[in-house]
Amino acid sequence: MSRRTDKVNELLRREIGTTIQRDFEFPGTIVTVIEVEVTDDLKEGKVWVGVVGKMAPSQVLEKLNSRHGLIQSAVARRVVLRNTPRLTFRLDDSAQRGVDLVNLLEDIDKNLPKAPPADAENDGE
């Protein structure tokens, strides 16, 4: 991937994220644009989103993909490119895996026996 493509990917990631926050509502759910990958000719772009919260990720993706034209138009007004890529949204489940891992660690911590205070260890000498 070229340096220019990397810059376009980052610019689109920010603009798509802003558009989603401003124009869409996902009650009780956080939707984050993780990464954007455009083709070298800028005709197509894959948008990887993380979904954490009450809504099913499939519902979020369905809503975003069904309204990709609105998102593309909003991005085209703010970003000047020869072509505005046709966007397709895909799930990046790393955010949900991170939340699940934190919850698992908290559960393990609750079930571990408590360590004796540091002072109690020194009193036995």
Swiss-Prot record:
Keywords of this entry: Cytoplasm, Ribosome biogenesis
Annotated organism of origin: Akkermansia muciniphila (strain ATCC BAA-835 / DSM 22959 / JCM 33894 / BCRC 81048 / CCUG 64013 / CIP 107961 / Muc)
Stored Pfam families: RBFA (PF02033)
Molecular-function GO terms, alphabetical: ribosomal small subunit binding
Location relative to the cell: Cytoplasm
Domain of life according to the entry: Bacteria
One Gene Ontology term from the biological process aspect of the record: maturation of SSU-rRNA
Protein name listed in UniProt: Ribosome-binding factor A
